[in-house]
């Protein structure tokens, strides 16, 4: 998820015209402020103006930070079947812990790994957050092989979290946080992967608030294999009779949003008889998109890294969700996060929502921790993020 090429592209094109659905204005925006022919720069909010279909002629003279205030127009029927509502279906938080102790299997509950605190989840729930992505390790759930029986203790603990979240009316995303691997080796047996998902889905088939995430951040894998693993998961889930649930599919190269439209184009071929596929992407705002630094590249980087994914979703008639995002507790990152979320909000015809990375009881002073009441991310960002809840 390196950002070098992207950064140079935007630097070179800073004075060029913005493309279809691209950003063209907003507080702190230093990129293009005019649009290609057939599109007009329309004010969405103080942070974001967007090139939307219109008849305004292109112009090459505009101040770099000018906010354009013309009337917003709807996307054409040829590219989308619905206009953006400006309201997310889901907005929430990742919950980490069940996947901790990587490489130590099975590990001990309370020593190598833990499960989310349902009390702090309810604290977030009371503020409007309505989706929680809960990580777990496949090696702990099925210790012997992908097709083997469940570890009952681990499944029981996971199920307790599922029931607590969904009984509150929120959605829970079951996230095998395995990077397309099992015991460190790339999963290549698609039949076994299908069976794994058929077995998992059978346990939650009657709970429509459960969302199945095929696997966290496939990376450095054959692209066709990533397609086939996702399709096998979909097929297994539906074969279990789990027909009411959404399925989040992830892409190669850490499912990065900024490179999605050049890396994961083949995933448009995924099929689901229930038509409930949502494309999950992740995006961080530091120099290499890794989410390992408190520093963000710029106040505009959030939008810059997501526009290509937005265009891909719309062009292919797909729905997306930003399954992980975060930024450091500083003003530059806050502006970048705000711009990112405003872009998603302006494009809710294709973006269903977003989830912050991450809450969880063991984060301590982790730079992005969203664990109430004192997590660094929670204390700095909660007042902003909760304004985006449905």
Curated annotation (Swiss-Prot):
GO term, biological process aspect, one: glucan catabolic process
Record's keyword terms, sorted: Glycoprotein, Glycosidase, Hydrolase, Secreted, Signal
Known glycosylation sites: 157, 261
Catalytic function, reaction form: Endohydrolysis of (1->4)-beta-D-glucosidic linkages in cellulose, lichenin and cereal beta-D-glucans
Compartment(s): Secreted
Purpose: Endoglucanase that plays an important role in biomass degradation. Binds onto plant cell walls to participate in the hydrolysis of cellulose.
Protein name as it appears in the record: Endoglucanase gh5-1
Organism: Neurospora crassa (strain ATCC 24698 / 74-OR23-1A / CBS 708.71 / DSM 1257 / FGSC 987)
């Amino acid at each position: 998820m390196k950002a070098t090429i992207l950064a140079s592209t935007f630097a070179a094109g800073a004075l060029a015209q913005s493309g279809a659905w691209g950003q063209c204005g907003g507080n702190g925006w230093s990129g293009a402020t005019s649009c290609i022919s057939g599109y007009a720069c329309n004010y969405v909010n103080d942070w974001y103006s967007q090139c939307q279909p219109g008849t305004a002629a292109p112009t090459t003279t505009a101040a770099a930070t000018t906010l354009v205030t013309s009337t917003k127009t709807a996307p054409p029927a040829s590219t989308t079947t619905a206009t953006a509502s400006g309201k997310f279906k889901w907005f929430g938080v990742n919950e980490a812990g069940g996947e901790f102790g990587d490489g130590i299997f099975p590990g001990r509950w309370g020593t190598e790994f833990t499960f989310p605190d349902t009390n702090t989840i309810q604290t977030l729930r009371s503020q409007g957050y309505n989706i929680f992505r809960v990580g777990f390790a496949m090696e702990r759930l099925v210790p012997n092989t992908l097709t083997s029986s469940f570890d009952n203790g681990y499944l029981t603990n996971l199920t307790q979290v599922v029931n607590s979240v969904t009984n509150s009316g929120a959605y829970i995303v079951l996230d095998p946080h395995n990077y397309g691997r099992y015991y460190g080796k790339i999963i290549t047996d698609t039949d076994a992967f299908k069976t794994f998902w058929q077995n998992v889905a059978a346990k939650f088939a009657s709970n429509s608030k459960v969302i199945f995430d095929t696997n966290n951040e496939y990376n450095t894998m054959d692209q066709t294999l990533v397609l086939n693993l996702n399709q096998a998961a979909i097929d297994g889930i539906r074969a279990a009779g789990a027909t009411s649930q959404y399925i989040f599919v992830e892409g190669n190269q850490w499912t990065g949003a900024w490179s999605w439209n050049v890396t994961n184009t083949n995933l448009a071929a995924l099929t689901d008889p229930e038509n409930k596929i949502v494309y999950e992407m992740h995006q961080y705002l530091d120099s290499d998109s890794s989410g390992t630094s408190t520093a963000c590249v710029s106040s505009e980087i959030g939008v810059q890294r997501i526009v290509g994914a937005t265009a891909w979703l719309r062009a292919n008639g797909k729905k997306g969700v930003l399954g992980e995002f975060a930024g450091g507790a500083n003003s530059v990152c806050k502006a970048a996060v705000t711009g990112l979320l405003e872009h998603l909000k302006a494009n809710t015809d294709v973006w269903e929502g977003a989830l912050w990375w991450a809450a969880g009881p063991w984060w301590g002073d982790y730079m992005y921790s969203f664990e109430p009441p004192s997590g660094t991310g929670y204390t700095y960002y909660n007042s902003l993020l909760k304004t985006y809840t449905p």
